Amino acid sequence: MAIPHDDARVEGLSAVTLATHDMARAVGFYQALGFRIVHGGANEAFTSFALGTSFLNITSETHGPIQWWGRVIIYVSDVDAFYSNVKAQGIEPHFAPRDAPWNERYFHLTDPDGHELSFARPL
């Protein structure tokens, strides 16, 4: 087992991502609740609403029937170091850390029960 990086620690919950088959309907619903769009919109595949210091994300990239409940996004102090620690524990992420157009660096993995987790940091 590798020695973990001391600077790689969990800092808080960043976002919850939910799936939809109708982005315009979902955006209208959350805007009616007073949620403020910070990325995307009714005609986009991915929309993010600010919720204080966290976010509610909506994705229409379901690739068929919605088979999953969504994703938990957890902020970490250093995405690449945290990724290295995860790999050292024998856990295999879906992909190496990458930069997203919504200004986060992130990677995903699945827990033993099939829940998708994303570890991220704002760029």
Predicted regions and their residues:
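N-terminal beta-strand motif that seeds the catalytic metal site of vicinal oxygen chelate
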Residues: 1-27, 70-72, 120-123
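Vicinal oxygen chelate
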Residues: 1-9, 12-21, 47-50, 64-123
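A short linear hydrophobic-aromatic micro-motif
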Residues: 36-37, 57-59, 93-96
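Short, charged/polar, Gly/Pro-enriched secondary-structure boundary elements
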Residues: 54-57, 66, 114-116
